A protein has these predicted regions:
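Alpha/beta-hydrolase-fold enzymes
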Residues: 1-10, 143, 147, 162-277
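Short, surface-exposed "cap/lid" segments of acyl-processing enzymes
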Residues: 33, 38-118
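Alpha/beta-hydrolase active-site loop
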Residues: 123-142
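Short beta-strand immediately N-terminal to the catalytic nucleophile in serine-hydrolase-like folds
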Residues: 152-154, 180, 316
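Gly/Ala-rich beta-loop-alpha elbow adjacent to hydrolase catalytic centers
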Residues: 153-162
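Short alpha-helix in the alpha/beta-hydrolase fold that links the catalytic acid
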Residues: 299, 311, 325-334
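Short beta-strand/loop motif that positions the catalytic acidic residue
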Residues: 309, 315-317, 321
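Catalytic histidine-centered segment of alpha/beta-hydrolase-like enzymes
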Residues: 323, 343, 348-362
């Protein structure tokens, strides 16, 4: 449908109307998290969603019509988000929704919602996510779907949590794992990776001399507010943030444009806090010591042996990702024992590779085709 062309006066009028409404009722412009679901499990702030099947015969994803498959694949698909982003990113907009895309392909779709972390949740640790919650999540999906196996589609830190779970549990019920922009080798992740690599030895020396570890310090000192993650994300492309704000001003009259733009902005503006205990574990084990890349890691009292992972693995990296380099994401293939494993570099930055305007043509399409032959 072609948009009606508006004159300057009409554009000014609608710019004022939309500007006032955006200021007073900003949620009117947010079009994420619209897919219907049931909550099948919850523990503290974490919950698991089961999405309803689509009633449509076809849906539109990024301008392309996709027929809705009426026959379900036997193995359910579990979506695992990173800790810093809310679950909305998997159901970003009706026409750019990973949830709707995989529902249309005939998958029984589940999603983990890690919840809204506050300063009261500073005790949440890697052990909480990996050793306590992940087993419960997997079991709830298997019970709900009446399936003995599960496939996982994960993004960024969500992929690392899935890998740590598999490395500690030796769970053979996870048949397929997809990781998107997951920084397995953190010392290879751009400028931050080079800094971590450079300070690794000095940090070890200082820790040994002073007989002190970050792990011994109170967790409350390490709690990271969501706005910090938002700022760091935006600083990877400062000009992009400026241009986006300018574009919103110029298109204030266009309600549909505003809905998309403000929904995307909500992703980056409303990031979730990182719990202090989790940050301590990440900083020492994953960032400074790069333990996942080494293939072995201690999580609480459990040993994570990544060479015990033998499920099918598909990994992605974005060709313009400033946060997670291709070599950092590809490292997953080296630490697992899986025979069926592959890696793709696809168009997009850290967000674009996952849910950008062209992700459905690359990351999603490749994943859907790959899973189809492994979900019977």
């Amino acid at each position: 449908m072609t948009k009606k062309k508006l004159g300057i006066t009409e554009k000014m009028f609608w710019s004022v109307i939309n500007g006032v409404e955006q200021y007073v009722f900003s949620e009117n412009f947010i079009i994420s998290d619209l897919s219907d679901y049931d909550e099948i499990y919850a523990d503290r702030i974490m919950s698991v969603r089961h999405y309803h099947a689509l009633n449509d015969d076809e849906i539109e994803i990024s301008g392309e019509k996709i027929a809705v498959e009426k026959t379900k694949h036997k193995i359910p698909l579990l979506l695992i988000p990173p800790l810093a982003a809310t679950s909305m990113i998997f159901d970003l907009m009706p026409h750019r929704s990973i949830v709707r895309y995989f529902l249309a392909l005939g998958y029984d779709v589940y999603l983990v919602d890690w919840g809204d972390v506050t300063a009261d949740h500073t005790d949440l640790s890697l052990e909480t996510y990996v050793l306590e919650w992940m087993p419960q999540i997997i079991e709830s999906v298997k019970e709900s779907s009446h399936s003995e196996e599960v496939s996982i589609f994960s993004y960024c830190m969500g992929g690392l949590i899935a890998l740590m779970y598999l490395a500690t549990s030796a769970d053979q019920s996870v048949r397929n794992l997809i990781t998107v922009a997951s920084p397995v080798d953190m010392h290879q992740s751009g400028v931050a990776g080079r800094v971590l690599s450079a300070i690794y030895r000095p940090a070890q020396t200082i820790s040994s001399i002073l007989n002190v570890s970050l792990l011994d310090l109170p967790a409350r000192y390490f709690h990271v507010p969501g706005w910090t993650s938002s700022l760091m994300f935006k600083l990877t492309n400062p000009m992009g943030s400026v241009i986006n704000s300018f574009d919103k001003f110029l298109n204030l009259w266009d309600r549909e444009y505003l809905k998309e733009s403000l929904t995307m902005s909500k992703w980056f503006d409303d990031m979730v806090d990182y719990p202090g205990e989790t940050i301590k574990g990440m900083a020492v084990h994953m960032m400074l010591n790069n333990k996942i890349a080494s293939g072995k890691m201690k999580i609480g009292k459990s040993n994570a042996e990544f060479n015990t992972i033998n499920c099918s693995i598909l990994a992605f990296a974005g060709d313009t990702d400033n946060l997670v380099s291709a070599s950092a994401a590809k490292k997953v293939l080296d630490i697992v024992s899986s025979e069926d494993k592959s890696f793709h570099v696809v168009p997009g930055g850290h967000a674009g590779v996952f849910a950008g305007s062209h992700a459905s043509e690359s990351t999603w399409k490749i994943s859907g085709d790959w899973l189809a032959s492994r979900s019977a």
